[in-house]
Design a protein with these regions (language model features):
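A cross-family phosphate/adenosyl-ligand binding-site feature
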Residues: 1-124, 128-149
Length: 149
């Protein structure tokens, strides 16, 4: 499937070791689409061995040409304003998968998903659970049984 002329939301959660790959995917999506990044609190604020938060922020905003959504308040209008045709969560940590499967809405990314789903629009999740995939299986199964995931 080739995406062209779409408005795409691209959520980053705290799987920092995969940010470099996620940014490559982000670059590909921006070729023929308008992409806006959404970052969880941790992905927006934490410096890790995989890079400084400000460096990630600057690079992501440079790639997309758009300001990052990084607060719950700014993520909430995504659904009512129908901002995105599709929402991609890449990387999606096991913690975020658990929150989504249990309807815990306490980060900009989880709010973006909840708000986006109000319009029955698709959410694509790129799972990144490091060595915890088996522990996330139950939550992944719950999401697979819901519409638009």
């Amino acid at each position: 499937m080739i995406l062209k002329s779409k408005n795409i939301g691209f959520g980053f959660t705290g799987s920092f070791c995969t940010f470099s790959i996620a940014k490559e995917i982000l670059k590909e999506l921006t070729i023929e689409n308008n992409v806006t990044a959404i970052m969880s609190f941790n992905s927006y604020n934490l410096d890790t061995k995989f890079g400084k938060a400000t460096d990630h922020i600057n690079e992501i905003e440079s790639i997309t040409g758009n300001k990052i959504i990084y607060t719950i308040e700014d993520a909430e209008p995504i659904g009512p304003k129908k901002l995105f045709d599709i929402l991609v969560i890449c990387p999606c940590s096991g913690n975020t998968i658990a929150k989504l499967s249990n309807d815990i809405i306490d980060t900009p990314v989880t709010m973006a998903v909840k708000s986006h789903l109000r319009n029955s629009r698709p959410v694509v999740i790129a799972i990144s659970t490091n060595n915890g995939l088996s522990g996330a299986a139950e939550n992944i199964g719950r999401l697979l049984n819901r519409k638009n995931y």
